[in-house]
């Protein structure tokens, strides 16, 4: 079987209006993919930046996949949340990005969005916080049910991902 | 004796902890160590180091230059657990006690070549107001008992941090027998090496 190593970091996020941010992340793959070692989901620390407006998480990712096919190439999905001084959490953005398919080092910028909801919900979010969230997290990385949503832009999550491929040339796959 | 089918690959890292930007602090020193997986073992060089105390430059850069060498070689059979360098920066507080001014970690670049990395440095924060007050009153900041936790992904959801500086690292990476073991590391990149050699405020 061909092997893929995904080694890198969720560096941080820019462009969010909230200041104390953290990120829940996960990786979704097709049925032909098997995770040999590493954790496929996690949550970063909460960062309150003192200089500049970028929140830094430096969250390490180290995953080792074996695959029998190319279908279902890994997708990273992200949820950015903000935490206020009382420890309450509010959704700031959803986003996903495909793990790059060429070996080497990649800088990824993942744009995010959040559901808007009705005008009542928007008004409530502006005054008391909270706001609508997705019931099914798979909407983040699948395109199937998106057409029903009305969304607003969030900030951008920055990732530095290195990719190592093994035995792809043995099967004639050019990445 | 060059074996026809090697089972081990080597990763040689040279480089330096070049400089740092900490707008609020001065007279800092830096410790580094490496964190790596079970299949990895160092074969040569030093995997820990502690730098001199550097003061800020008296110019617009306000740079803390350490110019501290890194030279280590690892061997492994599996890229999982690829080495990360963990940095911790310390400096004196108003009473002259050494307190931590930042932790940071980054993976050693995967592909051979020359790489520059600017890594954000953060300190843990007290979670409760009472702890905040006592740490302010006693003049003791929260610290990690083992700095190596910053290289781990698990258990982070309980920590709150404050990022307050950057350290610039330079790596020269050489690998041996990765190709023979069937790994494709991609093209040799020199990402971020071009351009000025000292950090220019906040990297994006």
From Swiss-Prot, chain A:
| Effect of disrupting the coding gene | Mice expressing reduced levels of the protein in the central nervous system and kidney develop perinatal triventricular hydrocephaly, polycystic kidney disease, lack functional intact cilia and die at the time of weaning.
Location in the cell: Cytoplasm, Cytoskeleton, Cilium basal body; Cytoplasm, Cytoskeleton, Cilium axoneme; Nucleus
* Ranges for domain C2 B9-type: 2-118
Q: Which GO terms describe its molecular function?
A: gamma-tubulin binding
UniProt keywords (A-Z) are: Cell projection, Cilium, Cilium biogenesis/degradation, Cytoplasm, Cytoskeleton, Nucleus
Q: Name one GO biological process term.
A: cilium assembly
Keyword Nucleus (UniProt)? yes
User: What are the record's GO terms for cellular component?
Assistant: centrosome; ciliary basal body; cytoplasm; membrane; MKS complex; nucleus
Q: In which tissues is it expressed?
A: Highest expression in thymus and skeletal muscle. Also expressed in spleen, kidney, lung, heart, microglia and liver. Detected in brain (at protein level).
InterPro entries per UniProt: C2_B9-type_dom (IPR010796)
Q: Which family does it belong to?
A: Belongs to the B9D family.
Function per UniProt: Component of the tectonic-like complex, a complex localized at the transition zone of primary cilia and acting as a barrier that prevents diffusion of transmembrane proteins between the cilia and plasma membranes.
Q: Provide the assembly information.
A: Part of the tectonic-like complex (also named B9 complex). Interacts with TUBG1.
Which protein is depicted? B9 domain-containing protein 2
Its ancestry begins with: Eukaryota, Metazoa, Chordata, Craniata, Vertebrata
Curated annotation (Swiss-Prot), chain B:
Name any one Pfam family assigned in the record. Answer: B9-C2
Residue ranges of domain C2 B9-type in the record: 9-127
Which cell locations does it reside in?
Cytoplasm, Cytoskeleton, Cilium basal body
The cross-references to InterPro entries, in alphabetical order and at most eight, read:
C2_B9-type_dom (IPR010796)
Entry annotated with the keyword Lipid biosynthesis: no
Q: Name one GO cellular component term.
A: cytoplasm
The molecular function GO annotations come to: hedgehog receptor activity
Q: Which PROSITE patterns match?
A: C2_B9
Keyword entries, A-Z: Cell projection, Cilium, Cilium biogenesis/degradation, Cytoplasm, Cytoskeleton
The superkingdom of the source organism is Eukaryota
Q: Does the keyword Transmembrane apply?
A: no
Query: Assembly state and interactors?
Result: Part of the tectonic-like complex (also named B9 complex).
Q: Know the name of this protein? A: B9 domain-containing protein 1
User: What species is given as this protein's source?
Assistant: Mus musculus
